[in-house]
C-alpha cells in the first residue's frame, strides 16, 4: 500500500544521502 511505498522511498533517500555523505568525506580527505 501507500505506507510501504513511503517506506521504500525513505530507504532509497537514506541510501542516496549516505552515498553523498561518503563522497563528501572522500573528497575532504
Swiss-Prot record:
Which terms are listed as keywords in the entry? Answer: Amidation, Amphibian defense peptide, Antibiotic, Antimicrobial, Cytolysis, Hemolysis, Secreted
Give the CC-aspect GO terms.
extracellular region
Q: Which compartment or compartments is the protein found in?
A: Secreted
Pfam families recorded for this chain? DD_K
Task: Using the record's annotations, give every residue carrying the modification Valine amide.
Answer: 29
| InterPro entries named among the record's database cross-references | Dermaseptin_dom (IPR022731)
> In Gene Ontology terms, what is a biological process of this protein?
killing of cells of another organism
Question: Quick check: keyword Transcription in the entry?
Answer: no
Q: In which tissues has expression of this protein been reported? A: Expressed by the skin glands.
Q: Which domain of life is it from?
A: Eukaryota
Query: Major place of localization?
Result: secreted
The task this protein performs is described as: Antimicrobial peptide, active against the Gram-positive bacterium S.aureus, the Gram-negative bacteria E.coli and P.aeruginosa, and the yeasts C.albicans and P.brasiliensis. Has hemolytic activity (40% hemolysis at 128 ug/ml).
- Family to which the UniProt record says this protein belongs: Belongs to the frog skin active peptide (FSAP) family. Dermaseptin subfamily.
* Name of the protein described by the UniProt record: Dermaseptin-1
Task: Please give the organism.
Answer: Phyllomedusa tarsius (Brownbelly leaf frog)
